[in-house]
Amino acid sequence: AADIRDALRRDATWFQRLRKADAAVKEFVLHLVKPKPEERFTNCVPLIPLKVAAGNFGEPQTVGDGEWDYDWVEINTHRHLRKGMFVAQVVGKSMEPMIPDGAYCLFCSQVEGTRQSRTVVVLLRDTTDPETGQRFTVKRYESEKAVSADGTWRHIKVLLKPVNKDFNPIELTCEDEGSVEVVAEMLEVLG
């Protein structure tokens, strides 16, 4: 701890960099557009009015299949846009500094392949956070699996891990199977 304090005293620019990162999130402006159906997912995606909770669970909502009745936003990304992608705001501090509180992120509801070590949106169906009553969370997905004699596997434990060390992971066991759903993968922090 003393080494960290000494390093911070020698280099005070860390505070200025932190303030610039916070300002970047606050200055980010969404560009709402009204695309024709054939223009959707070319340079714009739907803005889901879901404030995904990075510290707790969000309001019970569902992510659709791309037929959105929401606002559309133009985004600047190197990614090839496709149906199932959307922008949502992440609130909470558990994923800082990777995802700043209040940041808008690009997500894809089609999570393909392994989820291991990916940042995902998870819905807990059968439970809510006792303090907030919310259901969605954004966390890094880690799982332990067991393989049976017939070659099939099952989850022994899933950890939904925050980036911020001030927060604890959410641990799910095989008893929680069926009550948890990965609904999207976080692709990019937009601002």
Predicted regions and their residues:
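Short amphipathic alpha-helical leader/targeting segments
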Residues: 18, 61, 116-117
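General structural signal for secondary-structure boundaries
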Residues: 11, 22, 69-74, 168-176
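Helix-turn-helix-like N-terminal two-helix hairpins of bacterial/phage DNA-binding regulators
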Residues: 1-35
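Acidic/glycine-rich C-terminal interaction modules and beta/coil loop segments
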Residues: 77-191
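Extended boundary segments
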Residues: 22-73, 189
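Generic structural signal for alpha-helix starts
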Residues: 2, 74-76
